[in-house]
Amino acid sequence: TLKGEVPDLTNCEVLGPNNNLKFEGNVSVESNVLFDLRKGPVLISDGAEIQSNTRIDGPAYIGEKTQIRSAQIRSGTSIGHHCKIGGEVECSIISSYSNKAHDGFLGHSYVGEWVNIGAGTSNSDLKNTYGAIKMNVGNVEVNTASNKIGCFISDYVKTSIGCFIYTGKRIGVASHIHGYVTEDVPSFTIHAKSLTGKSFELHKNSAIETQKRIMKRRNRNQTSYEKDLLNQVFEMTQDERYIAGVLKTDFSM
């Protein structure tokens, strides 16, 4: 059971049973926030900040010290701790220390830790035909039997501004994506095919240095374990990049 001080909701609106709104610790809720509890509970953890003009539809979870920036949080969304979230998020899991601070749509998707989703990035979670979405899993095409599947974004991924990700696409660890993403992206790849026709390998030393920088911004010290893990993933995914035709040259536009 979550127990905490209930913030002042005088200038907010609550739809549905009040006991479906739970606060843990001290939560900041600004004016003009709407909580829709008719489909399920909304749970908000200690230190979270809900800014004005936000709508949160239950069931939903907002993690510790996460900031919701005038966003639309739709049903079925779970957001980890120390995240910054804006735009629209629907039926998605966003892991801790990941940012989607700007406008853009994220739906029926999974986002790993330490991800940064650039301004205007959006994903598709529905085909134009409304048919079942097919995915490539282990070089085998799989019919998911679902018409609502977004994208799967691994740890440490960075998306550029104005990036568009098609249905059912997987983005590998530490990759950078630009423009339109119409195919799966291997780990440690700078994917810019819609802009340059090419994808380039992201050197593991660059990924490790970026890891160090982003952790420092969150007052975290990079550990030898975390560096070693990136090293190992880089080695384990070399065949993926080779099969995908990723170039071992410096990225250029």
Positions of PLM-derived features:
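Active-site-adjacent structural elements in folded domains
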Residues: 35-36, 48-54, 69, 77-84, ...
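Extended, small-residue-rich solenoid/repeat segments and analogous flexible loops
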Residues: 1-61
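Glycine-rich hexapeptide-repeat left-handed beta-helix
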Residues: 70-71, 82-247
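Glycine-rich beta-solenoid repeat tracts in large extracellular/virion proteins
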Residues: 34-37, 55-57, 73-74, 122-123, ...
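Membrane-embedded translocation segments of transport machinery
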Residues: 61, 67-69
